Amino acid sequence: MEMQLRINEYWSKRSDEFADARYQDLHSQKKEEWLSVIRSWLPDKKEIRALDLGTGAGFFAFLMQELGCTVTGIDYSEAMIDNAKKVMGKLGREGIVFRQMDAQKLDFEAESFDFIFSRNVTWTLPDPEQAYREMYRVLAPGGCILNFDANYGQAFKKQDLEGITEKQAVSDTSGYENPARSLAMLKERNQIAAELCICDEKRPFWDVQVLASLGMKKITVDLAAETHFFGGKPVSEAEKAWYNPAALFMVAAQKETHSLKK
């Protein structure tokens, strides 16, 4: 099976699980923490066109809409997009455009967005460098890319080497229903990660190099991004059930404005 289709099949199987979890997140402290972080990186302009790249169930698309952005959310998984639309209806929201689309081949005109947000997406892509090129292409001058991710692939490889077990990797004590998080699904996730080239890179240093090569001049890195969340409190049982054994990092990059030639 082609890698992109294999990745799509895996995440589509988990789409209902993600929709339930993200809906809960919209009614938790996590929402306020993410709103604070995103707000601090939005461009200083009245009307902001925002792209949620790898929107999943739409959690961040809804947050950016609350912050006054005109939002488009894309995901390769049609199942994820369907769930994002369902959550939008459940919330009584409207106005967000959710589209099935490949992050590595964006169907948008150049300079269509002022702000591009992504979390836990680049590590899942067969060609993340191409995804960055596409983000740069559709980002308007003065716009910002804000990417949260982690070295998940390397962590999953380590799990496999240490001998992953279902008891260690899957928790049902949180109240979340995780039908897709079986041992078979976890092994499939790890096998996919092992075949993705990005999982052999040193991140976020690799991300910085790619963004700089595209022409980004102002790049900010936070190696301890997770410290902005959970309110300084111990990780809850719900979070333990969704635990990923890798530290979250942030990469923010701003595209230069056009300079007038004399």
Description of each model-found segment:
Residues 1-46, 59-63, 83, 144-184, 222-225, ...:
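Conserved class I S-adenosyl-L-methionine
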Residues 51-53, 57-105:
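Class I SAM-dependent methyltransferase SAM/SAH-binding core
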Residues 104-115:
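A short acidic, Gly/Pro-enriched loop at the edge of an enzyme's catalytic core
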Residues 115-128:
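A short SAM/SAH-binding and catalytic strip from SAM-dependent methyltransferases
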Residues 129-141:
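A short glycine-rich, Lys/Arg-flanked "PGG" loop and its adjoining helix->strand segment in the class I
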Residues 197-215, 221:
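Short alpha-helix
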Residues 214-217, 234-262:
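Core SAM-dependent methyltransferase catalytic element
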